[in-house]
Amino acid sequence: YSAIQNHLQANLFPTLAYYKTLRENGINQDEALEYVRKETHKAANIKREEMKKLGNMPFAYTIYRLGVKKHMRKNFPDTGWTTEWVKCNGKEIHFNLHKCIYWELTKMYHCPELCCVYCENDDISFSGLLPKIRFERTGTLANGSPYCDFHFLKAR
């Protein structure tokens, strides 16, 4: 899957390598996570700016809702994620990820604490959809929840 390769090459492995290198060179966990946050937040802020283009369009929520399932299938395929669709209606788009390649690989490489940084980047990226679409989340696999929940709410 090219989508998986893209996640691995563009996001997962470079960040993981940077973090592991910092740790191997004596940087403590909290400090290493801060360095990684600074770097990954740059990409998340670029994504937020891209999201603003959609967020500023008329009927942004409807456009997002009509494309979200196809986007998820293409960019977050079953080989890396297990997606449970809960709602996709005129008020809310809600899905849960029960398996996530980021969580699986950070555990496999003995740095599960790094996964929360990837999750934080969702919050930054999706904030670009405001004010028409509000992103909410109650938990992630990385912070001990049984799944990562994604809620996109249509603004009133």
Predicted ranges, named:
Residues Y1-N6:
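N-terminal leader/targeting and assembly helices and adjacent pre-domain segments
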Residues A10-H110:
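Amphipathic interaction/junction segments at domain boundaries or subunit interfaces
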Residues F13, A17, N121, S145:
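Short, well-structured alpha-helical interface segments that form or flank functional binding sites
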Residues E24-N28, G128-I133, A155-R156:
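Secondary-structure boundary elements
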Residues T40, G144-P146:
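Short secondary-structure boundary/hinge segments and terminal tails
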Residues E84-R137, L141-A142:
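Short, hydrophobic/π-rich interface segment
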Residues N89, K154-A155:
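Short acidic-glycine loop/turn motifs at beta-strand connectors
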Residues Y147-K154:
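C-terminal edge-of-domain segments
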